Curated annotation (Swiss-Prot):
Pathway this chain belongs to: Purine metabolism; AMP biosynthesis via salvage pathway; AMP from adenine: step 1/1
Record key words, sorted: Cytoplasm, Glycosyltransferase, Purine salvage, Transferase
One GO CC annotation: cytoplasm
E.C. code: 2.4.2.7
Lineage: superkingdom: Bacteria
Pfam entry (one): Pribosyltran
Coiled-coil zones: none
Protein name: Adenine phosphoribosyltransferase
Catalysis: reaction(s): AMP + diphosphate = 5-phospho-alpha-D-ribose 1-diphosphate + adenine
Length: 184
């Protein structure tokens, strides 16, 4: 499959749920990508093939709560590197570092175990979707607090009209996404 056909193939398996969780929202549901083993393999392989390259190979994969865990753990396994979860506040049992970020109405906090990465580790930060970019930016800051370098952010879906991918790139974070839903 070519890169273009992989993107189109994956797009065909992303369900759009209108007016969820609120009127006017077009929710991009990735669960159909996970339900079919052939489609799931194509999805995971799209990430693994990119990061097998020596220049892009991470030391660690970090996944953002919660769908980033699904992708990140499998990609880390396939690359034979460690996986670390970045969780919502209060979900990790050991000493943590935390980062608070702004939401449209309020704020949220994510945490990482203080020993999850080592200074100098090259980290791939992965999630299912980039909307406003707040969660991924908070994850990047957490990893950098511990001395790691976030070499790239990755996601299945980019919603560029919400500005997150532009903000992340402007912060210096390279991004790799598989399906762009601009103008949809």
């Amino acid at each position: 499959m070519t890169a273009l056909s992989v993107n189109d193939y994956l797009r065909q398996h992303i369900r759009t749920v209108p007016d969820w969780p609120a009127p006017g929202v077009q929710f991009r549901d990735i669960t159909p990508l996970l339900q079919n083993p052939k489609v799931f393999r194509v999805l995971i392989d799209a990430f693994v093939h990119r990061y097998m390259d020596r220049a892009l190979r991470p030391d660690v994969v970090a996944g953002l709560d919660a769908r980033g865990f699904i992708l990140g753990a499998v990609v880390a396994y396939e690359l034979n590197v460690g996986f670390v979860p970045i969780r919502k506040k209060g979900k990790l049992p050991f000493t943590t570092v935390e980062e608070t970020y702004e939401l449209e109405y309020g704020s949220a906090t994510v945490e990482l175990h203080a020993d999850a990465v080592q200074p100098g580790d090259r980290v791939l930060l992965i999630d299912d979707l980039i909307a406003t970019g707040g969660t991924m930016m908070a994850g990047k800051k957490l990893l950098e607090k511990l001395g790691a370098t976030v070499m790239e952010g990755a996601a299945i879906v980019d919603l560029p009209e919400l500005g997150g991918s532009a903000r992340l790139r402007a912060s210096g974070l390279p991004l790799y996404t598989l399906v762009d839903f601009s103008g949809h």
